Amino acid sequence: MAVMMRTQAPAATRASSRVAVAARPAARRAVVVRAEAEAAPAAAKKAAEKPAWTVPTLNPDTPSPIFGGSTGGLLRKAQTEEFYVITWEAKKEQIFEMPTGGAAIMRQGPNLLKFGKKEQCLALTTQLRNKFKLTPCFYRVFPDGKVQYLHPADGVYPEKVNAGRVGANQNMRRIGQNVNPIKVKFSGRMMSPAEI
């Protein structure tokens, strides 16, 4: 009897579920609205009208952020070697951390800051981009006064995609297609990177 009850109970629920499915209304139709094909050429025209990127020029009269500390003597080498200058445009006055230690207040509008090392400019660039959503760029200034624009090299930061950018030190092959290292090491001759 107990076995019979177990088999009969699920049958009753199955029948009730069939009735519930049959009582549902039919599915509704979905209407798909598509934009006209004219929108794509308009976007292509906007991309074609974009002006070519040009290297920004350094304005030495740009004010520096308000900073009470010093660079630790790192700019003394600028008399014989080069130093680095970072510039950015701030929306408002804000306090930021200096890569050399301490804090400074960036001015509203253009800012210019000198450093002795390129790494300090990169560190400040990371902070300004991540925390303040600014777009800094930096330059190398030689002792004779010549200025070289450094970063971002083609106007787009390295982690972004830029059409036409050529990869540096790029091998277009899988790791399994590399030459066996033993053949290179014990060959008795130097191999060029093209052969490897």
Curated annotation (Swiss-Prot):
- Keyword Plastid assigned to the entry: answer is yes
Q: What are the GO cellular component annotations?
A: chloroplast thylakoid membrane; photosystem I reaction center
Which terms does the UniProt entry file under GO BP? photosynthesis
Keyword Plastid in the entry? The reply is yes
Annotated transit peptide: 1-35
Q: Which domain of life is it from?
A: Eukaryota
InterPro entries in UniProt: PsaD, PsaD_sf
> Where is the protein situated, by its record's location annotation?
Plastid, Chloroplast thylakoid membrane
Keyword list, A-Z = Chloroplast, Membrane, Photosynthesis, Photosystem I, Plastid, Thylakoid, Transit peptide
Q: Which Pfam families match?
A: PsaD
Its membrane topology is listed as:
Peripheral membrane protein
User: Which PANTHER family does this chain map to?
Assistant: PHOTOSYSTEM I REACTION CENTER SUBUNIT II, CHLOROPLASTIC, PHOTOSYSTEM I REACTION CENTER SUBUNIT II-1, CHLOROPLASTIC-RELATED
What is this protein for, i.e. what is its function?
A: PsaD can form complexes with ferredoxin and ferredoxin-oxidoreductase in photosystem I (PS I) reaction center. PSAD may encode the ferredoxin-docking protein.
User: Which family is this sequence assigned to?
Assistant: Belongs to the PsaD family.
The name under which this protein is listed is Photosystem I reaction center subunit II, chloroplastic
Upper lineage:
Eukaryota, Viridiplantae, Chlorophyta, core chlorophytes, Chlorophyceae
